Amino acid sequence: MFVALRDLRFARGRFILIGSVVALITILVGFLSGLTGGLATQNISAVLAIPGDRIVFSTPTNGTSTPSYSDSTVTEQQSKMWSAADGVASVEPIGVSQTRAEAGDARTAVAVFGVQPRFDDTAPTQDGSVSLSTPAAADLDVTVGDEIQIAGSTYTVETVAGEGWYSHTPVIEMTLGDWQGYSAATGA
């Protein structure tokens, strides 16, 4: 103890430097933790907001063992099978793809979710209309009632709400029927 106190007295600069480095490393770790948490949230916030307690994928056909939203296609027969399973209250299909949306001179990359009209509070109620997340509406500079284009088709903005992100792109919800037509036309 005596030697440590004597070292502190005679080498103050060294101990201040070491203490400063430890404090800066602690601050850096805190910043990096916040950054990774924010990036993770922006990557999957729309998926986390999906109402339900399970998500079902089809078996990958491309030889991989990991299912993904972009490769999974659940047939109507598979959907009916899951609906009949014990403990399942309901089954809702959802389509997920990535594309570009346009409104006037504004263009932005977006994630498009095809959902049933009763899927969530912000789901569009009819074909030809879309629900935009707040970031998507800001990027396209549109509000409720404006029109946007996705893959050459025009849609009316019915709702602007939420902070949905998927794969670091803002989310647009459209009806499942519109999404299936868009998906078939673009191969998405």
Task: Label every model-predicted segment.
Residues 102, 110-188:
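Basic-flanked hydrophobic alpha-helices used for secretion and membrane insertion
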Residues 1-29, 40:
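N-terminal Sec/SRP start-transfer signal
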Residues 1, 50-53, 87, 106-108, ...:
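Short glycine/proline-enriched coil/turn segments at helix->beta-strand junctions
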Residues 3, 34, 38, 174:
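Charged, alpha-helix-enriched surfaces in structured cytosolic catalytic cores
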Residues 27-108:
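Hydrophobic, regular-secondary-structure patches
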Residues 5, 44, 145-147:
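Short, acidic/polar N-cap/turn motifs at the starts of alpha helices
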